[in-house]
Amino acid sequence: MNTSAVAASATELDPRVENLVQGAIDLHCHSGPSVMARYLDHLEAMREASEAGLKAVLLKDHYYSATPVTYLLNKHFSNLGVLMLSGVPLNNAVGGLNVHAVEHGIKLGARLVWMPTFSSANHIDHHKQDHKFTDKFPQTKKKMI
């Protein structure tokens, strides 16, 4: 085992790793604001991506499309040289499998459509034993229909 790698500072990157991220695209960035706690906000994510040399970042939130936010980031912070993208998450917050959300998202510039994640039957069934599930994935209190 290479103990020097373990002892290296977290801020020191192996040059091979740095070369890999140059021009890369992060396809799954959970920045904020969000109803769930996030480590950094969308602008901080853009700045960190710029510093790392990434070409683009795709922002994902389980509750809303960040596409309008990416439009503003790209317009006002183009000097950072990172293209910010987003898509449409088809969880309950946007009506689930909602063709209208997809159509409007695409018109706004969405680049990806995510099938339901935390609101899918499979995800709920998998996590039903977790008593903190609704803390991790906030849910609506009442059915709409």
Q: Which residues fall in each region the model found?
A:
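Extended substrate/RNA-proximal surfaces in nucleic-acid metabolism proteins
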Residues: 80-83, 91-145
